[in-house]
C-alpha cells in the first residue's frame, strides 16, 4: 500500500507497529518546515501520552536516514529542519526470538 502524497507545505509522518496501534493510523501530515527538535511536541499535542508510551523507545528516520533525536534537541534552533515533501517515520523497537 502506498502512502498518499503530502499536501503542499507538509511532510509525511509514517507510523509502524505500536505507533500505528496508538494513533490508529498509518500516516499523518504535518506542516513544514518544522524543527525536528519540535516534532515530538507536535505529535504529543495531537496524541496525548504517545511520547511516554511510544516515542521515547522508538527510533526516527528522515528520508530513510536514522536521526539521533536527543542530539537534535540539544542543537535547538540549529538542528535538522524537516522540509515540505520529506518522509519521516517512527520505528518502534523490533524484537526477535
Ranges and model annotations:
Residues 1-96:
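Ubiquitin-like/PB1-type beta-grasp interaction modules and other compact soluble beta-rich domains
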Amino acid at each position: 500500500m502506498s502512502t498518499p502524497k503530502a499536501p503542499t507545505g507538509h511532510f509525511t509522518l509514517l507510523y509502524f507497529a505500536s505507533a500505528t496501534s496508538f494513533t490508529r493510523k498509518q500516516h499523518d501530515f504535518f506542516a513544514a518546515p518544522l524543527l525536528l527538535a519540535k516534532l515530538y511536541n507536535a505529535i504529543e499535542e495531537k496524541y496525548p501520552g504517545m511520547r511516554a508510551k511510544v516515542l521515547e523507545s522508538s527510533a526516527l528516520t528522515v528520508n530513510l536516514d536514522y536521526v539521533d533525536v536527543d542530539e537534535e534537541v540539544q542543537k535547538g534552533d540549529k538542528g535538522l529542519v524537516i522540509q515540505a515533501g520529506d518522509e519521516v517515520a517512527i520505528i518502534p523497537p523490533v524484537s526477535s526470538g
